[in-house]
Amino acid sequence: MRTTIYVDGFNLYYGCLKNTDFKWLNLQVLFSHILARHHSINRICYFTAVLRKSEHDPRAHLRQKAYLNALQTLPNLEIHYGKFLRHQVRMPNANPPPKIVEVFKMEEKGSDVNLSVHLLNDAWKDRYDCAVLVTNDSDMAEAMRLVKKGFNNKKLALITPRGRPTAGLKRYADFAKTIDDADLAVAQFPYRIKRPVASDIYKPQSW
């Protein structure tokens, strides 16, 4: 069964990777481990946005760059980029006075829209028999509904980063699975990834 996997990168990170030792994650190995053998993974579509250098964590963007380079060594993986928007908002201060302060807030934009568009477009172009969504974001429910309504020969699956899947997503899934630590542990890249032309990639030290 031709299976395409759509990964909400930030939902995956905050759902089951942050504050763990499993961030150096090989997605091809992970999903081959989780899915049954009749699934032939033809593409993995990874949706993310490039981090900017920040005072809070000045090396975060370098760790992300190393990981994206590692992902690009996987032959059937595509990376689709959204972007971060920086805007000024008024929010309550944790230690007043004053009670309200102006802060700069970074928000990732585009990943959920990009994922939905690719999911529908790939169904229309008959690029998969089964689409697997790796997310627990309820915003994906409408795209899943449209696929089920318009392409009744297509299967939809849901892999959630820990916890119970959102009811609004699960109702459109033919099956659902949850990622646990055992899945993550067996799907780590090696510390050093050799490349035939470019320089080798190393797991970030702080990971």
Explain the meaning of each model-derived region:
Residues M1-F104, K155-A157:
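Domain-level signal for Mg2+-assisted phosphodiester chemistry and nucleotide/NA-binding surfaces
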Residues H80-W207:
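Nuclease catalytic cores that cleave nucleic-acid phosphodiester bonds
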